[in-house]
UniProtKB/Swiss-Prot annotation:
It comes from the Eukaryota. This is Molybdopterin synthase catalytic subunit. One of its GO terms (cellular component) is polytene chromosome. Pathway: Cofactor biosynthesis; molybdopterin biosynthesis. GO terms for molecular function: molybdopterin synthase activity. It is an enzyme of class 2 (transferase). GO terms for biological process: chromatin remodeling; Mo-molybdopterin cofactor biosynthetic process. Belongs to the MoaE family. MOCS2B subfamily. It catalyses: 2 [molybdopterin-synthase sulfur-carrier protein]-C-terminal-Gly-aminoethanethioate + cyclic pyranopterin phosphate + H2O = molybdopterin + 2 [molybdopterin-synthase sulfur-carrier protein]-C-terminal Gly-Gly + 2 H(+). This protein is produced by a bicistronic gene which also produces the small subunit (Mocs2A). SUPFAM superfamilies: Molybdopterin synthase subunit MoaE. Catalytic subunit of the molybdopterin synthase complex, a complex that catalyzes the conversion of precursor Z into molybdopterin. Acts by mediating the incorporation of 2 sulfur atoms from thiocarboxylated Mocs2A into precursor Z to generate a dithiolene group.
Length: 361
């Protein structure tokens, strides 16, 4: 039988010995841990123990299971640990085991105290006499991972500013101000989409009896004028929509290759009538057309190339992939009016047939 307990009062050693005693056992081994009176020249008054009780009891039970798996002959196992303040020379932990032979009992108690120190979440604080501050004692036998004390010191690493990093290795070339502006624009667009969705969910309902359906109301209240209808096969009253991010880091794998896409768009948008007389003018004119620039063929070609470069840098700093691959949000599309067919009763149909019979003699 396993006897496991965390107690906040003095441990009765005699009672513990009686618990593990059994007529079939010829050996009983017991370990008693007490509070010593000094540590590194300082007078120890008492020890204070704290524990995560639920986890500690589970670990102690696992230790008992490991003991029985290793030494099946064990009859009784006892693990008592005291919490709170433990004065000098009083027992803080008692571990005992009984078995038919002494070898199993002695080895089991040794194994149990080692595992208790390394696995069970119990913390010890030493209280000293005089003006010495109390100290929490680190368990050097614990198998739990410890935080690395040797953190990386960035000040030791010297930055070699003489080396010029190639611009091809830099993915984002915008400065901090431009990055902040992009993030703010992204937040504004998402906020506008959410507001548009809220307007659709909580728009003015024509089902209200006190409001004329022919009158359009710009301002409405969602708490008093919205109509809640439970969706089929759902516990929610509002319609749940699946969010589809048409742009962003999650869609990187679905994005086409920009070089091939740029080539395709360039060739598809350029008309054969706009090709200049020379090959150089025609190719430069195609790039200018795609970039949205207007120039004359007789203009200086150096100035035209410079304008194209400035345009490319501008588009590169404002994320050009959104120009061609961003799909229009469904929120921007006008809402389609739902046409409902009128339902006629049997009486109305008879009246209608009777009137038609009179009109057609």
């Amino acid at each position: 039988m396993n006897h496991i307990k965390l107690i906040d009062c003095p441990i009765d050693v005699t009672y513990a010995i009686n618990l593990i005693s059994d007529p079939s056992c010829g050996a009983s081994s017991i370990f008693i841990g007490t509070t010593r009176d000094s540590f590194q020249g300082k007078k120890v008054v008492s020890l204070a123990y704290e524990a995560y009780e639920n986890m500690a009891l589970k670990e102690m039970d696992k230790i008992c299971s490991d003991l029985r798996a290793t030494w099946p002959d064990l009859k009784h196992i006892l693990i008592y640990h005291r919490l709170g303040t433990v004065p000098e020379n009083e027992a803080s932990v008692v571990i005992a085991a009984s078995a038919p032979h002494r070898s199993a009992a002695l080895k089991a108690v040794t194994f149990a105290i080692d595992q208790l120190k390394s696995r069970v979440p119990i913390w010890k604080k030493e209280l000293y006499e005089g003006n010495h501050d109390a100290e929490w004692k680190e368990n050097s036998e614990s198998i739990r991972p410890k935080k690395s004390l040797s953190s990386f010191n960035y000040s030791v690493c010297k930055v070699d500013e003489s080396r010029v990093v190639s611009r091809n290795l830099v993915q984002i070339r915008a400065n901090d101000c431009e990055l902040k502006n992009r993030v703010e624009c992204f937040f504004k667009r998402k906020r506008a989409e959410i507001n548009s969705c809220n307007v659709i969910d909580f728009k003015q309902s024509n089902l209200s009896s006190n409001i004329n359906s022919d009158t359009e109301v710009d301002v409405s209240c969602a708490r008093t004028q919205s109509t809640i209808s439970k969706q089929e096969q759902s516990n929610c009253h509002l319609k749940v929509r699946r969010a589809t991010n048409r742009c962003g880091p999650q869609q990187m794998q679905f994005r086409p290759k920009y070089k091939h896409e740029l080539s395709r768009l360039t060739t598809s948008r350029v008309s054969t009538n706009e090709v200049g007389e020379s090959l150089q003018n025609s190719r430069l004119h195609s790039i200018e057309t795609y970039m949205g620039l207007t120039s004359k063929n007789n203009e200086n070609i150096i100035n035209r190339i410079k304008n194209v470069e400035n345009r490319i840098l501008l588009l590169e700093s404002t994320s050009p992939e959104y120009q061609h691959f961003f799909e229009q949000s469904c929120m921007d599309q006008p809402e389609k009016k739902i046409k409902t067919n009128k339902t006629y009763s049997a009486h109305e149909l008879r009246v209608y047939i009777h009137r038609k019979n009179k009109e057609c003699p």
